[in-house]
């Protein structure tokens, strides 16, 4: 894939609009390919609707360059037994491979950090796969490892 240099001054970060679906979807599919998952279209459609439903604590923000979406971040707020205020969980972060290495991922994380501050969140956290070494370089630069190890158990 060919790299594209972008002028960071031309990058705008903003909440996704409902009309951004067609531009967001290819990046969402690429994100799934990266993680070797195939999320059903019904879940994708439901997720997109949740981003815009007033009672849902799920959000999507996009990075745009010259009107084109080049990255996204999904985040949500949830209660914690460890704090009075909500935690903010950054669930998904993806930047178009053609524009990686230009701090767009960092800007998207900082966008979520700002939203968490506005909501007086007690914590902002996220996970990544142990094989996502490029992502870990960014995360080690902007945050600290918590020392927590994640376990999963099937419920079906």
Annotated model-derived regions:
Residues 62, 68-77:
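Conserved beta-strand in the GNAT
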Residues 117-127:
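Conserved GNAT acetyl-CoA-binding A-motif
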Residues 78-90, 100, 146-147:
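A conserved beta-turn-beta hairpin within the catalytic core of GNAT-like acetyltransferases
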Residues 12-26:
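A short beta-loop-alpha structural element at the N-terminal edge
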Residues 106, 130-149, 153:
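Conserved active-site alpha-helix within GNAT-family acetyltransferase domains
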Residues 99, 103-111:
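Conserved acetyl-CoA pyrophosphate-binding loop and the N-cap/start of the following alpha-helix
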Residues 25-50:
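Conserved GNAT-fold acetyl-CoA-binding loop/helix
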Residues 50-62, 89:
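A short helix-loop-beta-strand connector motif used in the catalytic cores of GNAT acetyltransferases and
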């Amino acid at each position: 894939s060919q790299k594209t240099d972008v002028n960071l001054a031309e990058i705008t970060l903003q909440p996704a609009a409902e009309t951004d679906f067609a531009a967001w979807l290819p990046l969402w599919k690429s994100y799934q390919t990266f993680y070797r998952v195939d999320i059903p279209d019904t879940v994708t459609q439901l997720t997109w609707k949740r981003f815009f439903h007033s009672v849902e604590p799920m959000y999507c923000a996009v990075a745009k360059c010259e009107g084109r979406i080049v990255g996204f971040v999904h985040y949500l707020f949830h209660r914690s037994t460890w704090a009075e205020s909500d935690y903010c969980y950054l669930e998904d972060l993806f930047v178009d491979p053609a524009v990686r290495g230009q701090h767009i991922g960092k800007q998207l994380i900082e966008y979520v950090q700002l939203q968490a501050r506005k909501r007086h969140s007690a914590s902002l956290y996220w996970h990544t796969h142990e094989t996502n070494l490029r992502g870990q370089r960014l995360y080690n630069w902007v945050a600290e490892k918590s020392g927590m190890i994640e376990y999963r158990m099937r419920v079906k």
